[in-house]
Amino acid sequence: MRYNIFLRIFTLRYTQGEKIKMGMTTLCYIEKDNKYLMLHRIKKEHDINKDKWIGVGGHFEHGESPEDCMFREVMEETGLTPTKYRFCGIVTFLSDMGTDKEAWEYMCLYHIEEFKGKIKECDEGVLEWVEKEKILDLDLWEGDRLFLRYMQERIPFFSLKLVYEEGDLTAAVLDGKPLEFFDILDENGNKTGRIKERSLVHEDGDIHGTVHIWIRRKTGKGYDLLLQKRSKQKDSFPGCYDISSAGHISAGDEPLETALRELEEELGIKAEPEQLKKICMHEGSMNGNFYGREFKNHEISTVYMYEETVDITKLKLQKEEVEEVMWMDQEELIQKVKDGGIPNCIYLDEVEKF
């Protein structure tokens, strides 16, 4: 009885006259000698995964548990029998399939660490062992790159929701928290019409928009600039000195609204739009390797100046972003950036502009 109710949930239903396909599947990544067994989907002509590289797996059959489905699909597609495996998470897919209809699917993700048997030819495509560090060179769905990383990093059991529109990943939610997406820009700083999840942007080095807000005060010998020290928990350049306040422009947002929000979130400064003076645009690239992952940053920044009186003892710092702040003479800062006098992620040519 309970199964019949469950089965009814994952049948076709109608919304405003259009069918929504619903189902449950498994996807399995088999590992051996630091390689994954990947399936290149090139055999079927009408295949939503045509030419993509994926793991092995498929749809549940009547009465199957996730493990039943996993064992059966792995045997059918590879000839192997898993002997050690992890149930890594649930991935929810919502896709328009490039049509006016939606498909809604729940996928059980498995990492198979040990197995027995010999690999056979697969009717779904071509099986190939691929070194883990070369997986990202393959033609993967963008969302696959996210759950592959979570699987590889062995994060606790997770729930990931992926939304696709006309084949492009347009939204993702990890354990109930929406992931951030950016507009992808061309070389002239214009929006291309594509959006992309934040971590994938920094894996690929895509051009994206940011805002930089410099807080400046006049002194007897020139100007002081307010620097923030990035939190040690930051995913890039932890513990480095940086611009007074900065942030990414989320997909669909504008630079000024982003700058006002970042000032308030990071420092507790509630500025008025007219108090932020746009001084220039800046394009910069800065790469690194953090926590074992390559980080490629290529940004086009709208740079603002804020010159209202600021008492740093009264600032409300966002602790997960900012460890501390301090004033520094502008010329001294330029010299320290040049000679590496302080750990920093500041663009020298930007701070020299004003």
Please provide the spans of the model-predicted regions.
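Conserved Nudix-box catalytic region and its N-terminal flanking loop in Nudix hydrolases
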Residues: 36-76, 164-177, 198-210, 221-261, ...
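Short, solvent-exposed loop/turn segments that connect beta-strands within catalytic domains
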Residues: 48, 99-102, 218-224, 293
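Short, well-structured hydrophobic secondary-structure segments
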Residues: 61-96, 100-103, 212-216, 256
